[in-house]
Each structure stands twice: as C-alpha cells, then as structure tokens.
C-alpha cells in the first residue's frame, strides 16, 4: 500500500469552533481519511506506549504558536514520512492500534453512521452475493460474511480475498487493490460514488499446488471453477484450439476437477491481468499488457508486423523493486500549502538480473503500479512461507462468542455457461527462439496458427544462474 499526504485543508471546527489544518491521507492515490495533527499525535503516543519509543520513527514535534504556510508544508512532509514508515514496519503496520485508527478515521471522514446494510460482492464470473454487514465491519468481517453466505468452510477462508475493482463497459474487471485490514469495505466502495466500482471475491494465492486444499471442498471447487472459466473467457488464460476443445468437453461432462487439472497446465493460469500500460523494455515507451502470477511478471507487447510477444521476469531474479509517484505542479510551476495536486503518475521499477553479472532496471508506468508491487510482495511472501514449510491457512480472528456467523439463507455458486469459441487472435501460442535484450520474448501466435502444449516454452534466458547469485 502506498500511503501519502499530498495535500492539506484549512477547516472550521464543529459548531463554529476555531479553524484547524486537516491532513488528507491517501492510499494508492485515493483519499482514505482526513485527520488533524492532534489525532496523529494521539496515535503516535499510543504506539509508543505499546511498543516503546525506540521502535517508532520520528514524529514532528508540537508547536506553541500557529504554523506559517511553510511550516504547515514541512509538517505535512514529516507526517507523510511517518505514516509511510509505520505502515512499512511489519510490527507497527499490522498492529490493531494502527489499523483501527485508520478504520475509525475513514468512517468519520466519510460521515457514515454505523448501521446494518446490504453489501453486494461479485464472484469472478459476475454472480452477485448479497451479504448483511455493518458499515463499520472491516475487511475480514465482510470476507467471513461472504464465506458464510456461500457455506465456504472456515479453514478455507484464508485462501480467498476481497478486491476492489472497476467494472469496464465490456464487463471486464480492472483491479484497483486488494482490500486491506485497515479499511471498511462498505465505506471504501461507496465513498468512490460510482457504480463502476465493485468488490470481487477471488483466490488470494499464486501457487496452483494450493488448489488441492481448496478443491477438497465442494464450494471451494465451484469457486475455483467459476474463476477459471471467467479467466479463459476474458483471454487471461492462453489456450490453443485443441486445449479449448478438451476444456469444453470436460465442461459438458461436468468434470470440474479434471477441467481445473487441465487448466493448471495452461499459460497464465491463476494470473492477475492489468490494464494496458507503458514500459521501457524492450524499448522506451513500449505499450505492454502486464500479468502477475506463477512467481513472475509477464509483459505482452505487440512488435512491428503485429506479432505478439511475451517476456517473463521472475521474482527470484529481482534484486529489489520500488514504486515512485510524481505529481505535476499546478499551472504556474509552483506549489503552495493547502492546494490540491494534479493526477499522480505511478511507476513500478525493478532491478533485474539480466545475466550472471548484469543487473538492469525495468520501469513500468501504470496507475496500477502499486497493485503490481503488492502482487510481487505477496508472491515473495508465499515463496518464503513454502520454503519454511509453513501453510497459508491463517488463523481467523473470531467474533464475539468465538464462532463465525452463518447466514440463515446460503447461496450456491452458479455453474458458468459453456466456453465460447476462442478468439482467433489469441487461440494459440508458438515457440520462438528470438530474444530481446537477454530476456526471451515468446510469440503468442497469429490468427490461423496452432500449437500443442509442448511447444510452449518458458523463459530460459537465465539458464545456469541460481537464486543464490542474487
């Protein structure tokens, strides 16, 4: 998550009280809450009481007199660095003190009273699930409510997450972010004041080996099946004509497990796909489509001649990555305290091991750069958990009474319709041996071509380089 305080506001106190400066905290470039310095000071003091002063980053000191505009701007910058440092700290950023502060501030900023409401959550295939929640319910509360409505067992809830998406005109989803523990889903989606924004339930892991755990349960199997069919229909999962024929045959037989077993062998199974954006690889200002999954970032690009190519960047070859944001100055070239900034430009840059002794920075410019970064981090976290022999089954925080609320009226996951005929522009993949800048770019076929699964090859540009070389 990218925390920033890009602007301040001068506001009047309640009931005609004295004016004060409000600091607008943004998450991923969107306003999350509006707080006073005194509120952040109270948070700091509470964290210091719980964790000790040595753990906390520096907090801007109190001032005896009113601040000048320059001092307000200086404090804004200091508070922004403080919030970023706290969020990035594994102990402080995951603490209930920090997260509950942000939830309360979000609810107060949007002036949403605590009451019971119906919240619509979509499955990957577009099926609607209506759950009764409180406006003050946090993300885990809502996730549990959806699981209860679908009759998904408690021990499988941790395999799924809620995502905030924007629904496009063609019905496809553009992923905004994974909903976090510091926000209230009802407030997050309604505060955007647009019917385009939805909440979607989707599996939250990358390694398809974990599918086995989920497929043991009927509801889990249906959720994976519905998501996979939807991803194939959207073109997120790449299939040949023959593979498509086999999948449709398994659909007709209602062989869901066999369908998923075959789908697991397909390119981009379980990937998240992002909107078209721009990268500086293999050349500057190159239009690309980025997908994340299977411990890699995949970049698809169309070269002269309309041939579609794909380059893969493994997370185990990334030395580090960073997200940077830049904001154009208002007309006139100068910025002043309290003035709003322009649209934020986001970039994800990662340093990649191109050859045994050569690292190169690759930059992707996209409004979804932070979501890409979160995907990278979660892939690394999952690899570390697997390496240590751990499990992604997480212990759930229990509600009062120690049990999960189960809905009186449960809802089944609808079986999706049969697959439609594949789009000729993406019906196959073919092997290409050409390489650009030491990263192999695989061809993804042209209309009328076909290939078997054995013709699909991974990125072997780094053969002979071990992970220990990083």
UniProtKB/Swiss-Prot annotation:
Main location: cytoplasm
GO biological process, one term: signal transduction
InterPro entries: PH-like_dom_sf, PX_dom, PX_dom_sf, RA_dom, SNX17-31_FERM_F1, SNX17-31_FERM_F2, SNX17/31_FERM, SNX17_FERM-like_dom
Membrane disposition: Peripheral membrane protein
Region (FERM-like): 115-432
The Ras-associating domain, residue ranges: 115-206
PX domain boundaries: 1-109
Region (Disordered): 400-426
UniProt name for this protein: Sorting nexin-17
């Amino acid at each position: 998550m990218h925390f920033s305080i890009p602007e301040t506001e001068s506001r009047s106190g309640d009931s005609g009280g004295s004016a004060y400066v409000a600091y607008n905290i943004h998450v991923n470039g969107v306003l999350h809450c509006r707080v006073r310095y005194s509120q952040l000071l109270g948070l700091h003091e509470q964290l210091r009481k719980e964790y000790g002063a040595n753990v906390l980053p520096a907090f801007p000191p109190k001032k005896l007199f009113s601040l000048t505009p320059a001092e307000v701007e200086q404090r804004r910058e200091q508070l922004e660095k403080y919030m970023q440092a706290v969020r990035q700290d594994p102990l402080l950023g995951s603490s209930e003190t920090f997260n509950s502060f942000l939830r309360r501030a979000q609810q107060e900023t949007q002036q949403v009273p605590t009451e019971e409401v119906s919240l619509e959550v979509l499955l990957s295939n577009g099926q609607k699930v209506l759950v009764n929640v409180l406006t003050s319910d946090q993300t885990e509360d809502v996730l549990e409510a959806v699981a209860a409505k679908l009759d998904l067992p408690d021990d499988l809830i941790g395999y799924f997450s809620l995502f905030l998406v924007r629904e496009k005109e063609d019905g496809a989803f553009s992923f905004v972010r994974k909903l976090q523990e510091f926000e209230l889903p009802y407030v997050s989606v309604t505060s955007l004041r647009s019917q385009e924004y939805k909440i979607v339930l989707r599996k939250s892991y990358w390694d398809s080996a974990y599918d086995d755990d989920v497929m043991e349960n009927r509801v889990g199997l249906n959720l994976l099946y519905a998501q996979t069919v939807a991803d194939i229909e959207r073109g997120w999962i790449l299939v040949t004509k023959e593979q498509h024929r086999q999948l449709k045959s398994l659909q007709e037989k209602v062989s869901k497990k066999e369908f998923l077993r075959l789908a697991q062998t397909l390119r981009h199974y379980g990937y998240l796909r992002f909107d078209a954006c721009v990268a500086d690889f293999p050349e500057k200002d190159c239009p690309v489509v980025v997908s994340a999954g299977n411990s890699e970032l995949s970049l698809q690009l169309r070269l002269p001649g309309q041939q579609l190519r794909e380059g893969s960047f493994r997370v185990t070859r990334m030395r580090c990555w960073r997200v940077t944001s830049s904001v154009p100055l208002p007309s006139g070239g100068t910025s002043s305290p309290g003035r709003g900034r322009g649209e934020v430009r986001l970039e994800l840059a990662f340093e990649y091991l191109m050859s045994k002794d050569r690292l190169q920075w690759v930059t992707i410019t996209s409004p979804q750069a932070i979501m890409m970064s979160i995907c990278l981090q979660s892939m690394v976290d999952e690899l570390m958990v697997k390496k240590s022999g751990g499990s992604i089954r997480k212990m759930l925080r229990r509600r009062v009474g120690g049990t999960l609320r189960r809905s009186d009226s449960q809802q089944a996951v609808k079986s999706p319709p049969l697959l439609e005929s594949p789009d000729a522009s993406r019906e196959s993949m073919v092997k290409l041996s050409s390489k650009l800048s030491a990263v192999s770019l695989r061809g993804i076929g042209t209309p009328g071509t076909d290939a078997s699964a054995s013709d699909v090859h991974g990125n072997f540009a780094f053969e002979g380089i071990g992970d220990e070389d990083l």
